[in-house]
């Protein structure tokens, strides 16, 4: 007599995924801290002797279940930048960005201190990007309700697809905040919700690989080749 093993429930699968994801997050975050420590020290030195001497930038972001937390980033802009110019919207060649900060932003190195948020449990390596309240409010109500059922991530499908967000906003004749709200936010919300529905260890591993790939090859369309049903961007 063959006894069939009962299929795992959605809750069991979700719990297993959450457990494995947390282990991977800790392993990757610790590895980054240890391997890149000398590099981090060099960046800290450069930031101390250039610009305004600021090293880390702490900012309140929306996290899992829409709870706020404080994010770590390398400082790339002048002090009080949120209250200057376009606020939370950053433009290409934004005058608020410091000389060193410009290169940190292009290479996304400014995001690496968020491994500390990963170790603290506020963030994951992969997930929807954590937003400030003003840009979070640009999302449709359904997206606001669902997007942070997953922990926010250092990278994710939204981060990859909109890696040229600053360029898009700068090239538009529409006022930046309106362009973000009317054009970018609706589609960006769609792709972040796509991740929530398709998240798995394999999906996360693919996204991590694709993140590295598009940093080296910015024009690559690998994200859409890897995930065929990902909502397409038509602008």
Summary of predicted features, one role per range:
Residues 57-96, 158-186, 190:
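Short, glycine-rich, amphipathic interfacial segments at transmembrane boundaries or analogous
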Residues 43, 58, 85-86, 126-128, ...:
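Short, hydrophobic secondary-structure boundary micro-motifs
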Residues 90-153, 208:
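A short, structured surface patch at a secondary-structure boundary
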Residues 1, 125, 138, 145, ...:
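Soluble, non-transmembrane catalytic domains of enzymes that act on hydrophobic metabolites at membranes
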Residues 29, 57, 98-102, 134, ...:
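Positions in alpha-helical segments
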Residues 2-3, 8-81, 195-235:
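A hydrophobic, helix-centered structural microdomain
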Residues 46, 87-88, 144-148, 179-180, ...:
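Short, P/G- and charge-enriched loop/turn segments at secondary-structure junctions
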Residues 55, 65, 123, 129, ...:
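Gly/Ser/Thr-rich beta-alpha loop segments that engage phosphate groups in nucleotides
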